[in-house]
Amino acid sequence: AEYSGYLDSATRGTLENARLGINHEPPQDFDFQSGADDDQLATATSLAPVVARYEATPGLAEQVTRATRVRQKHPRSIAYMQIHARLLVELLSGTDLHSAVHRVQETAVQDPEFGPELALRFRDVFERKHLSTIEATAQLGQSCPLKNSFPSALVAVIQTPDDFESTLLRIVAAGGDNAGRAAMAGAWLGAHL
């Protein structure tokens, strides 16, 4: 039987790129590095186990890129997943949340393609941390693209870094792609707490 339910754009695009055969299997030469041209939260929701496995290895960045490219080949997705992974590594190593965010920010702004965008988005987060999560998310963006969802998740975590439940409830109350933002924030808080 063929699945006919909801598929996010990354999954749909990846399946199209795989050109699945009659048995719903990809061709033998498919390298699983041809994900969708998608810049949303798909990989963010499942990257934490990859980071936990490779955090202490020199190959972490390559593994994050490879894991991202399974479902998303968009350069923005790869850049933001590298930032997501670096934040997880900092938190898993015991760095306090605020220091971890600032350390990651320092490297993020050096990204050759997305550095200016990331610098702006980190600044946007810090400028809105005193607003309610609902107000901050409305300004930063409720939608799925990472340039909106990443800062919206981050501001909620910065506001209450030691309160898992409150943070996730405020993310849910802010609407939009709250499930994706909550998955990313939950990974950060899980690594932090």
Segments from the language model and where they lie:
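Structured, active/binding-site neighborhoods that engage oxygen-rich ligands
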Residues: A1-L193
